Each structure stands twice: as C-alpha cells, then as structure tokens.
Amino acid sequence: MKHIPFESSKYYHIYNRGNNKENIFIETQNYIYFLKLMTKHLLPIASIYSYCLLSNHFHIVLRIKDENHLPEKMQIGKTKIHQPFSNMFNAYTKAINKKYKRQGSLFQ
C-alpha cells in the first residue's frame, strides 16, 4: 500500500489488489478472517462506511476518527496512524502464506 499521510477527521478510499493480479481471497474463511482483522485493527482508529471484498482485490471507504477519539498511542506525535493498516495487511499476508504454503508479497 502506498504510504500517504493519514489525517484525523478525513475520509479515505483504501484499495489494494493481489500481487501479479493473483487472488487474495481463496475461500470463504479468508473473507471472514480479513473482516475480523479489519475490526481488530481499523475500528479503533476509523469509522468504516463501506467495503467490497473481491477475489483479487478490495476497497474500503473509511473516515479516520477525530484526534481526541483516537487511542492515545495513535495521536499526533506518537505512533503513525498508518501502523494499524500495516499490521492488518501483514497479519493477513502471514496467515495466507502459512495456510497455502506460499511465500512473499500477497499485495501489489
């Protein structure tokens, strides 16, 4: 994912696709796990307005919470707001790589 400077109280369209246009969701359980990771990593910092998960890519429309509603460690000058996104994508990639005995980047 391209690093852009996320700002509190702003809306974003987050999207990514599989490396080499490969599928990132192989079976139903993959979609469910991705949604669980979204809940765990993104809901503490953002309101999710919509999402679309397709076999080889996804879209998420969200709004980063106001500064005073962000967890303390995410507030300006502490940890970067992009860190939960990185954690989510890394966790998903590791799970897919382990389950399907693959290695390397999952996302483009």
Regions found by a protein language model. Give the residues of each.
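Short catalytic/metal-binding and nucleic-acid-binding patches
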Residues: 1-108
